[in-house]
Regions:
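A short, surface-exposed helix-loop junction/capping segment
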Residues: 1-5, 45-48, 75-79
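Conserved pre-motif C helix in the palm subdomain of viral-like polymerases
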Residues: 49-78
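Conserved polymerase palm-domain catalytic core
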Residues: 26-30, 34-40, 45, 77-81, ...
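Short, compositionally biased low-complexity segments
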Residues: 1, 37-39, 67-73, 150
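Short, conserved beta-strand segments within well-ordered enzyme catalytic domains
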Residues: 13, 41-43, 53-55
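Non-catalytic, polymerase-adjacent accessory regions of viral genome-replication enzymes
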Residues: 1-17
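A short, contiguous, amphipathic alpha-helix enriched in charged residues
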Residues: 13-25, 134
């Protein structure tokens, strides 16, 4: 590909300035493929490990660009009661929602953690749903490539 993917973050401005034309061309042609993710395992409170795939800097920038485009497309369809990883939503908002719900008469709450949720997402179903709203095959191929490396 000719585009270096691993470099110190401090070199980002210099590297992206020289390499962006090649990255842009690959994105436009639909030939860009994300680089391999760096693997890292971090301990969970119960002692088990959570395995992470950390993308390189260029791939992170591209993922952020995709997020900025997809968020306004999909955000209106998400539950008002969902607060995780959503714009303008956080733990404080979730607590306020819980307090409002309690004040309205509810007395029970379910707390759950979907074990290994992202490991169990059906890739074909996810991509089918995304493709209903995203028609550009280059974007779909890019999302699929990112998903496969995660």
């Amino acid at each position: 590909m000719g585009v270096p993917r691993c470099f110190p973050l401090e070199q980002f401005a210099e590297t992206i300035a020289t390499d962006w034309p090649a990255v842009k061309q690959q994105l436009l042609e639909g030939t860009y493929r994300p680089g391999p993710a760096r693997r890292k395992s971090i301990p969970k409170p119960d002692g088990s490990l959570r395995h992470l795939g950390i993308p390189n800097v260029v791939d992170r920038v591209i993922q952020q660009a995709i997020l900025q485009i997809l968020t306004p497309i999909f955000e209106p369809h998400f539950s008002e009661s969902s607060f995780g990883f959503r714009p303008k939503r956080n733990a404080h908002g979730a607590i306020k929602q819980i307090q409002t719900t309690i004040r309205s008469g509810y007395r029970y709450c379910v707390d759950m953690d979907l074990s290994k949720f992202f490991d169990r997402v059906q890739h074909d179903v996810l991509m089918m749903r995304v493709s209903r709203k995203v028609r550009d095959r280059r974007v779909l191929r890019l999302i699929g490539g990112i998903y496969e490396l995660a």
